[in-house]
């Protein structure tokens, strides 16, 4: 909800994940969508998965641990993007499903292949990250002032309720040279599917997160600190239901579940992130960062039934299984994994001027990462990388060029009956961009970027040797930005991403070739900022056309709506500045997604397996307690989510595992800040 004492900010002053330097968003040569702390607070999402659904062009792909890569996202039609802390440190498998968004200062989504900056994702067992990166910036201790925030929200709808409590305390000490911050959340939720059907009576979702952090600044040139996070979630498993002609099929209703009462998904993790910033000279900054993230998860999940052969054709035609079956168990219905991620980087940023009017920013960064996951979810792999990037600005023009080299070492690994051999590989990922600002209100920009990542740890069909040559995703993009008001910018861009050498898998998940090809073309628009000093706005539109070039021309499977062709979101808030409603803030949001098809491993199945267009409207109002004779430090928030009760599918794994969006819910909350 919206805090009435200050208007929400939807547009950041600077962005760092696009270049590893702080740059105003209008001057970037690439597209970066940002979700600010104010935006996150208003949406009050359960986790990162729920938050990213507000960004057109991002597909969340199913909220379940019963997948090979849980917690990854599709950007611009390309799958497998794993979220990262500070643009460099991956969260690890599953974390994207459970990361509480209240911990985040902001989220920056860089559109397009970005391995030329932060490296490829090797050994994640998929053609991952070709469409962009999702970068999380956690709240951390700061030296500005003492601050305490307490917030509680309750949401109630038909067959569902949710209660959240949050606190955020920052204390400055040692004469302003040190600070400690403690952020925490707790969440209790009864989703619709545990109050009816096969899962009726299951225990609700219980989750909590604690995130202490510390910062110390002994002098003006050195600042160091540490961020930590401890997470625990125990929730009823949910994998969705089959879809047929836009509605639930196979004997299921909108808010049914195939899971049993005792099916659970449990996630635990801790993260330690020490860091140091050293301003060596006026022009030279050194940044050191590292992280250790260890997580474990386990799940038991009964899936919706799916048939084969004639029975499958019968389902395509009728939406029902001729056998009458509704449920099934598989080798993946019960699994667990221990995940370890270690990351280390040293970033040198040299920012200077030549001849008084030529600016130059040189970034050099060596880094190292190691990751492993038990249970067959990831081979132990080390990545050694180095980045070289230079940016030159003169008058109207800013030119950026960079290249990154990565060396991968994948250890020998045994999972069940599968033996993965040791492998090593190399990849070079370049990028370049330009922005031209002939007028204060007009910016032209463009970029060419390439991600090259080896595919390590894949299981192949008999006789096919493992592949270590990298797949490639190459983007060409151009656009223009207009300042339509003092703090309101309109951005328009068009892009084309071509992906080559992608592993192709059979129905069992084994690689049968390395010759996959696809193309993603699109157009995006965004309008963000302040229309007036009392009216803020964020609107985003994405058009995407995906082509599977392995399929013959003219076939439906070659050019189909794997993702919605059109997606749009609008969010706004307005603060009354006079009259009886002075300091009251009203807000609203609207999300639209056009039709798309339900797939199996990303491939077209049948025209009847589709998702219909959806329209979701949210409204909210924030009223300071001073309106009732109380303190203006306290704010009452009221809201309705999914105002018109739209029934829709918000994401899917396969055509028989589609997850329904939340029904209409009414929310009340209290927030205090002092």
Language model segments and positions:
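Periplasmic plug
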Residues: 27, 34-35, 54, 65, ...
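A beta-strand signature from Gram-negative outer-membrane beta-barrel systems
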Residues: 101-151
């Amino acid at each position: 909800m919206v805090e009435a004492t200050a208007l929400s900010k939807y547009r950041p002053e600077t962005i760092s994940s696009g270049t590893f330097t702080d740059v105003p968003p209008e001057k970037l040569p690439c597209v970066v969508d940002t979700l600010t702390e104010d935006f996150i607070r208003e949406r009050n999402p359960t986790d990162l998965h729920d938050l990213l659904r507000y960004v057109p062009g991002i597909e969340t792909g199913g909220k379940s641990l019963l997948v090979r890569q849980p917690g990854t996202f599709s950007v611009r039609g390309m799958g497998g993007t794993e979220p990262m802390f500070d643009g460099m440190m991956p969260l690890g498998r599953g974390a994207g499903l459970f990361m509480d968004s209240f911990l985040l200062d902001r989220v920056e989504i860089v559109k397009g292949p970005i391995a030329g900056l932060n490296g490829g994702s090797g050994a994640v067992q998929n053609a991952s990250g070709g469409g962009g990166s999702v970068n999380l910036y956690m709240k951390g201790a700061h030296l500005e002032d003492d601050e305490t925030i307490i917030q509680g929200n309750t949401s109630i709808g038909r067959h569902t309720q949710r209660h959240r409590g949050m606190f955020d305390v920052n204390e400055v000490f040692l004469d302003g040279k040190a600070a400690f911050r403690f952020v925490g959340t707790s969440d209790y939720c009864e989703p619709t599917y545990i109050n009816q059907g096969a899962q009726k009576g299951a225990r609700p979702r219980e989750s909590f997160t604690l995130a202490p952090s510390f910062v110390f600044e002994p002098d003006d040139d050195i600042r160091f600190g540490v961020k930590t996070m401890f997470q625990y979630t125990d929730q009823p498993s949910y994998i969705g239901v089959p879809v047929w002609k836009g509605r639930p099929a196979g004997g299921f209703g909108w808010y049914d579940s195939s899971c049993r009462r005792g099916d659970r998904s449990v996630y635990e993790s801790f993260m330690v992130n020490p860091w140091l910033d050293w301003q060596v000279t006026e022009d030279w900054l050194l940044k050191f960062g590292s992280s250790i993230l260890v997580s474990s998860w386990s799940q038991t999940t009964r899936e919706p039934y799916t048939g084969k052969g004639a029975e499958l054709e019968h389902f395509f035609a009728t939406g029902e299984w001729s056998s009458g079956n509704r449920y099934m168990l598989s080798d993946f219905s019960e699994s667990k994994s221990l995940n370890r991620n270690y990351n280390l980087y040293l970033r040198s940023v040299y920012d200077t001027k030549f001849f008084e009017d030529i600016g130059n920013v040189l970034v050099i960064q060596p880094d190292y990462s190691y990751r492993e996951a038990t249970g067959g979810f990831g081979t132990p792999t080390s990545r050694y990388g180095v980045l070289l990037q230079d940016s030159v600005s003169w008058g109207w023009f800013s030119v950026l060029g960079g290249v990154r080299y990565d060396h991968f070492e994948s250890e020998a690994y045994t999972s069940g009956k599968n033996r993965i051999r040791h492998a090593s590989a190399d990849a070079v990922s370049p990028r370049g961009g330009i922005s031209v600002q002939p007028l204060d209100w007009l910016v032209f920009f463009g970029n060419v970027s390439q991600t090259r990542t080896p595919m390590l740890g894949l299981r192949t069909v008999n006789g096919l040797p493992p592949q270590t040559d990298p797949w490639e995703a190459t983007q060409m993009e151009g656009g223009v930005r207009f300042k339509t008001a003092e703090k309101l910018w309109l951005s328009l861009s068009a892009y084309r991403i071509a992906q080559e050498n992608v592993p192709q898998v059979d129905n069992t998940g084994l690689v049968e070739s390395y010759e996959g090809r696809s193309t993603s073309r699109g157009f995006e628009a965004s309008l963000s900022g302040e229309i007036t000093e009392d009216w803020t706005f964020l609107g985003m539109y994405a058009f995407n056309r995906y082509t599977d070039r392995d399929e013959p021309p003219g076939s439906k499977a070659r050019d189909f709506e794997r993702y919605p062709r059109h997606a749009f979101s609008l969010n706004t808030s307005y603060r009354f500045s006079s009259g009886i409603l002075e300091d009251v803030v009203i807000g609203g949001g609207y999300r639209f997604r056009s039709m798309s098809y339900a797939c199996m491993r990303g491939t077209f199945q049948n025209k009847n397996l589709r998702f219909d267009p959806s329209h979701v409207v949210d409204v909210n109002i924030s009223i300071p307690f001073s309106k009732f004779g109380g303190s203006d430090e306290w704010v009452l928030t009221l809201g309705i989510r999914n105002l018109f009760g739209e029934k829709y599918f918000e994401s899917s794994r396969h055509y028989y595992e589609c997850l329904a969006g939340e029904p209409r819910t009414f929310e009340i909350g209290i927030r205090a800040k002092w």
